[in-house]
Amino acid sequence: KHRPSRQARPGKSSFFRLLAVKDEWFSDDLRRLDDDNVYRKLQGHWIIEMSEMIATANAKSIEEIKSFLSKQKETYKVPYETHPADRLRQCVFAGTTNRQDFLPRDRTGNRRFIPIPVDAELAEVHILDNEEDSRAYIDQLWAEAMTIYNSGNYKLAFSPAMQETLQAHQQDFMQEDAQ
């Protein structure tokens, strides 16, 4: 599992909210990974924004972060239900931050994080300029993604060369070692 992490100024949350297509499929309410209600907060949402990477910053360890991000299902009891039930994850996580050094130091690698620097100055059109146009553009993006998916001509894993490039890129976003 990989989690894109966008770096930019205004518009980060709006981008992911619009990318979710319907506002109710987006949530930015994840503050702690050990919250008793964390799994209920995931249900019904397609994109979960970890604003300013707060949830990962509040985590006790990198292992807690990796375990949380890697789960494919949750088992918990909803109030008034008799027994816990398995619920498959149907969401992706997107971390946003204005900091450059947001990736945790992980001796096993940070394969769960894909930093995507965004320079709003280079954008031809800013996502906040016109929400209707932005939604139309994102609808087109999803239509093209669906065409690629239906063609079967895609890979869900990075090639070794791409993994090597990503690892080098991630170094630019690593937290400095504490002295």
Identify the meaning behind each predicted range.
Residues 1-44:
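P-loop NTPase catalytic core of nucleic-acid-dependent motor ATPases
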Residues 38-43, 78-96:
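AAA+/SF3 P-loop NTPase mechanochemical coupling elements
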Residues 44-46, 72, 89-92, 108-114:
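Short glycine-/polar-rich loops that comprise or flank the Walker A/P-loop
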Residues 46-69, 103-109:
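Conserved AAA+/SF3 P-loop NTPase catalytic/coupling segment centered on the Walker-B
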Residues 48-51, 77-78, 90-98, 115-116:
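Structural recognition of the conserved hydrophobic beta-strand(s) that form the central parallel beta-sheet
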Residues 62-85:
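Conserved catalytic/switch belt of AAA+ P-loop NTPases
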Residues 103-124:
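A short helix-turn-beta junction within AAA+ P-loop NTPase domains corresponding to the substrate/partner-engaging
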Residues 156-179:
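DNA transaction DNA-binding modules
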